[in-house]
Amino acid sequence: MLSLIVEATLLLVVLVLSAHYVRRRMKSLPPGPIGIPILGNMLDMPTHDEAQTIAGWSKKYGDMIFVTIAGTPFLYLNGAKETMDLLDKRSALYSECDMGGLVPLTGYGDRFKLERRLMNQALSARAVEKWEPLVAEETNMMLKRILDAPERFIPHLRRMAGSLIFTSIYGYRVTSDDDPYVKAAEEFMSVSSHAILNGWLVDFLPFLRHVPGLTIHKKAAEWKIKMEEWVEKPHAMFKATLADNPDDNSFCRTLLFPEDGHPIDAETEERIKWVATSMYGAGSDTTVASLSQFILAMILHPEVQKKAQNEVDAVVGRDRLPTLDDRARLPYVECVLKECLRWGTPVPLTIPHRLSQVDEYNGHILPEGTLCVANIWAMLHDERIYPEPHRFYPERYEGKMDAEQTRLLDPSTYIFGFGRRRCPGIHFANPSVWLGMVSLLSTFTFTPSLDKKGREIIPPAKFISGTFRHPEPFKCRITPRHEGVPALIEQVQPAF
């Protein structure tokens, strides 16, 4: 009797799986691993190095990979062409995302459009020019801190990025490594990816909302409290100190007090608060990840470091620090920046774009509600675009190319996202990272740390999985490039 039950159960499982397989193929869904009833592909999903693992699936399934997680359809886009065809050219269909209050997670509607308009108004290429002196000052102060305590280079990068963002958003200068607003914001960002994941899990399995005592509910309550603190406290501080900063040209002052003199309504002010919060989340971690990846790359590739430093010396000299005005005359440094962004990929995956209606592409049916995730890491390590993708090789960007080739090869085409959800902060983030990188090249040399016997300890090129791809903690030696560096850095005076 027992054997009959077992056999019947196995037969039922086979029938269910077969029906699931046939149903998928009849609907011409894109290929992907076959899941199991109810859970779908939940057990197939990687718990770490998600972008790299899913990129590897392309060898079997191609550049469009379809999976379901507890009934929710996902489409992973590993190829640049497929991503641009769908998320850029058909952005009207692929712009939904309603997973939280931050701008990148807001549903595509009137609120999102207002918030994006506010961000574009403050972050256009022309608008961010007013912050170039601030970028220079914070970069130079970062150099001074590294000179004084080189072993704390990561905290120095974090303070520089935090102060740069907080000053440009709120007109608030960060004066210590223990600044309460920066610490609160970093704490929030450290848990945000986990909180978002918990939110997705409830979306996949709605019945979990009604199961008491789950850790998810406790975490959701903590997320809500931290979200409100992060949004409300900096804004309240900004308004309380308005009278003390009459010359402040920050993002919040510009938007709260328009030049036309017309007061804004309460709804617009509420949106400004959320936009300000989103700008910190998007800008600070990206800057720290990019610059720490750069330092790691220079340690691992001393020949690249030396070649870039020689170019800086030839153009800038050794009697001053680089400025943004030098950028056009430093083509190899530009190549190093691009290769760092490609090799390190500070943002490996995009936030999901929800498909608002059924679509068809290359003979495949894409169901309404599908969450489309662009695998930026896969695109930036695609050997069809970047031969020898795992080699750190800045020279790949040299030589004559037409406009389309240049666009496809430039990592910024991918790093800042796609379609109507492309990050508008590119005009602020890119110059900030470039100036930080070239200033470090100008003043310091980065080499491996030494063990007790004086042997070099080469750090591995390993990265922490998460929304932002930071290198695993590593040690190194940071030494002034020449005897004039200390005096050069010390002579820098705050401009504000």
From Swiss-Prot:
Membrane topology qualifier: Single-pass membrane protein
Gene3D superfamilies, A to Z: Cytochrome P450 (1.10.630.10)
Q: Which residues form a coiled coil?
A: none
Output the Pfam families linked to this UniProt entry. p450
What Enzyme Commission number(s) does the record list for this chain?
Answer: 1.-.-.-
Mind listing the UniProt keywords for this protein, alphabetically? Heme, Iron, Membrane, Metal-binding, Monooxygenase, Oxidoreductase, Transmembrane, Transmembrane helix
Q: Name where it's found.
A: Membrane
Q: Where does heme bind?
A: 423
Q: What chemistry does it catalyse, as a reaction equation?
A: wigandol + 4 reduced [NADPH--hemoprotein reductase] + 4 O2 = arnebinol A + 4 oxidized [NADPH--hemoprotein reductase] + 6 H2O + 4 H(+); arnebinol A + reduced [NADPH--hemoprotein reductase] + O2 = clavilactone A + oxidized [NADPH--hemoprotein reductase] + H2O + H(+); (2E)-geranylhydroquinone + reduced [NADPH--hemoprotein reductase] + O2 = isoalliodorol + oxidized [NADPH--hemoprotein reductase] + H2O + H(+)
Q: What are the transmembrane regions?
A: 2-22
The annotated pathway is: Secondary metabolite biosynthesis; terpenoid biosynthesis
**Does this UniProt record's set of keywords contain Oxidoreductase?**
yes
Q: What class of enzyme is it?
A: oxidoreductase
**Function, in words:** Cytochrome P450 monooxygenase; part of the gene cluster that mediates the biosynthesis of clavilactone A, a meroterpenoid that features a unique benzo-fused ten-membered carbocyclic ring unit with an alpha,beta-epoxy-gamma-lactone moiety, forming an intriguing 10/5/3 tricyclic nested skeleton. ClaR, ClaS and ClaT are sufficient to produce clavilactone A. Within the pathway, claT acts as a multifunctional cytochrome P450 monooxygenase that catalyzes a ten-electron oxidation to accomplish the biosynthesis of the 10/5/3 tricyclic nested skeleton in clavilactones.
Q: Output this protein's name.
A: Cytochrome P450 monooxygenase claT
Name of the gene? claT
